[in-house]
From Swiss-Prot:
This is Nucleoside diphosphate kinase. CDD domains: NDPk_I. Homotetramer. It catalyses: a 2'-deoxyribonucleoside 5'-diphosphate + ATP = a 2'-deoxyribonucleoside 5'-triphosphate + ADP; a ribonucleoside 5'-diphosphate + ATP = a ribonucleoside 5'-triphosphate + ADP. Its cofactor is Mg(2+).
Length: 140
């Protein structure tokens, strides 16, 4: 496998409960390096652009409201097969279905407040990274 980069968000439900360090520890324990990270507060308009792919879904407005409700932590992770590894560490979207030891099983409050977001493919990762980070911010 090749070294990849992927994008991750620590969502408002997790930042509000001061779980950034605990989540980062799980990511790093899985062999992922954090090569860029910043804490930001999205506007609803910024969340709407980022999640535009879900615009026609019934949860879209609620998702945008939630993502703009509190600060988030956006990150670029790097490692061997980083996209798949990050998704494995995150666990299933629904925390009730997530495997033991995953971020969502341990920290998520519900399917909506599920603590983390991660890119699902290489193209998506590149787009999501570019939305939040300039090339100068990516170190590693």
């Amino acid at each position: 496998m090749a070294i990849q980069r992927t994008f991750s968000i620590i969502k408002p439900d997790a930042t509000k409960r001061n779980l950034t360090g605990a989540i980062n520890a799980k990511l790093e324990a899985a062999g992922l390096r954090i090569v860029a990270q910043k804490r930001i507060h999205l506007s609803k308009a910024q969340a709407a652009v980022f999640y535009a792919v879900h615009k026609e879904r019934p949860f879209y407005d609620e998702l945008c409201e939630f993502m703009a409700s509190e600060p988030i932590v956006v990150q670029v992770l790097e490692g061997e097969d980083a996209i798949a590894k990050n998704r494995e560490v995150m666990g299933a979207t629904n925390p009730a279905e997530a495997a033991e030891g995953t971020i969502r099983k341990e920290f998520a409050l519900s399917i909506g407040e599920n603590s983390v977001h991660g890119s699902d493919a290489e193209d998506t990762a590149k787009e999501e990274i570019a939305y939040f980070f300039s090339g100068l911010e990516l170190v590693g």
